[in-house]
Amino acid sequence: MNRKDKYYIRAKRENYRSRASYKIIEINNKYNIVSRGDNVLEFGSSPGGWTQVIENITQSVIIAVDINRMDPVKNTVFIKMNIFDDDIFKSIDHAMAENNIKNFDSILSDAMSRTSGIEDRDHYNSYKICERVMDISIPRLKNGGNIILKQFQGDMTNEFIKKWSGYFNYYKITKPKASRQHSREIYIIFLNRI
């Protein structure tokens, strides 16, 4: 973590857990993904920077999933689990039932595996995470719902978009200002589930 990074400094000053908070703030301000009262499923939630922002907007139930622990956030049910674990479906469905959630208004993923520095490998790993998130999400997303996913851009990005965009009215690709400029990370936004 670069302690001279302006987003890091700002996050500390504004009591956000990570600089990533400003990514979701910018994306949501531009695309209105999450609104008050929405039920949200979030992948890759730890340490909770996105979760804090989302809870402040929705003031409703968030189900957050991460392989790493996360300190509590108001109105958030946290599931500490690897999304590739076979029990992930059951765990999410149980949390939904416990909180009277039939389906989600928005699903967000900032999930990423540890980077290796090998671009093709990092892209492939992020692609597989996005595929898994979509497999979990599509049956649990309401009509009209939205999904955001982080992916390292690469040669499978277009294939991924082509595969999943048919479930939605349209999609966008964005790179928030808070993303490091040298990073290949992009955010794929699928809007208005059909």
Curated annotation (Swiss-Prot):
Coiled coil residues, start to end: none
Pfam families, sorted: FtsJ
Gene Ontology MF: a single term: rRNA (uridine-2'-O-)-methyltransferase activity
Reaction(s) catalysed (UniProt annotation): uridine(2552) in 23S rRNA + S-adenosyl-L-methionine = 2'-O-methyluridine(2552) in 23S rRNA + S-adenosyl-L-homocysteine + H(+)
GO cellular component: cytoplasm
Active-site residues from the entry: K150
Source domain of life: Archaea
Protein's UniProt keywords contain S-adenosyl-L-methionine: yes
Record: residues binding S-adenosyl-L-methionine: G48, W50, D66, N82, D110
Keyword S-adenosyl-L-methionine: yes
UniProt EC number: 2.1.1.166
Keywords associated with the record: Cytoplasm, Methyltransferase, rRNA processing, S-adenosyl-L-methionine, Transferase
Cellular compartments annotated: Cytoplasm
Role played: Specifically methylates the uridine in position 2552 of 23S rRNA at the 2'-O position of the ribose in the fully assembled 50S ribosomal subunit.
Family (UniProt): Belongs to the class I-like SAM-binding methyltransferase superfamily. RNA methyltransferase RlmE family.
Protein name: Ribosomal RNA large subunit methyltransferase E
Source organism: Picrophilus torridus (strain ATCC 700027 / DSM 9790 / JCM 10055 / NBRC 100828 / KAW 2/3)
The organism's taxonomic lineage, starting at the top: Archaea, Methanobacteriati, Thermoplasmatota, Thermoplasmata, Thermoplasmatales
